[in-house]
């Protein structure tokens, strides 16, 4: 996934998300077709386990088959099912483009347009090397 991020994120002039900002491995989901990784998606779980946040969906830029959308849709559905098994009652996500918005809408997500979204790194909490 890291190489995919480098490819996608360089288009926006940003560095990809660091591993420290991702959930534990058991909350990192990868979907493959015929042994070729197509996309990955991440699930953060809030305490108590009522709300989950799915994020950082990234796809293999070299996978250009026509079934790409359906494979990504299957990945989103699979993460929904895993969240449901854990007891999550609501999932939250932010769709960064038309394709992801369309996929989530087709899966009955309620999407609300957001004018601005933001984040801030609290760098005083970073380990200094």
Role assignments for model-derived ranges:
Residues 5-34, 38-59:
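A conserved beta-strand-loop-helix scaffold within acyl/acetyltransferase catalytic domains
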Residues 12-16, 82, 86, 129:
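Solvent-exposed amphipathic alpha-helical surface segments
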Residues 34-35, 62, 125-127:
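Short loop segments at secondary-structure junctions
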Residues 38, 102-103, 123-125:
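Short, solvent-exposed polar/charged micro-motifs at secondary-structure junctions
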Residues 47, 114-116:
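Short, ordered beta-strand-loop transition motifs
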Residues 52-109, 114:
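Acyl-donor binding region in acyl/amide transferases
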Residues 116-129:
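C-terminal "cap" of GNAT-fold acetyltransferases
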């Amino acid at each position: 996934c890291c190489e995919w991020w480098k490819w996608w994120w360089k288009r926006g002039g940003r560095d990809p998300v660091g591993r420290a900002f991702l959930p534990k491995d058991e909350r990192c989901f990868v979907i493959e077709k015929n042994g070729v990784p197509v996309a990955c998606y991440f699930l953060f779980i809030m305490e108590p386990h009522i709300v989950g946040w799915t994020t950082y969906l990234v796809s293999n830029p070299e996978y250009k088959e026509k079934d790409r959308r359906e494979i990504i849709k299957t990945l989103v559905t699979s993460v929904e099912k895993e969240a449901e098994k854990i007891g999550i009652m609501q999932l939250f996500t932010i769709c960064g483009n038309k394709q992801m918005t369309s996929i989530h809408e087709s899966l009955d997500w309620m999407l609300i347009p957001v004018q601005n979204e933001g984040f801030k790194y609290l760098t005083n909490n970073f380990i200094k090397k």
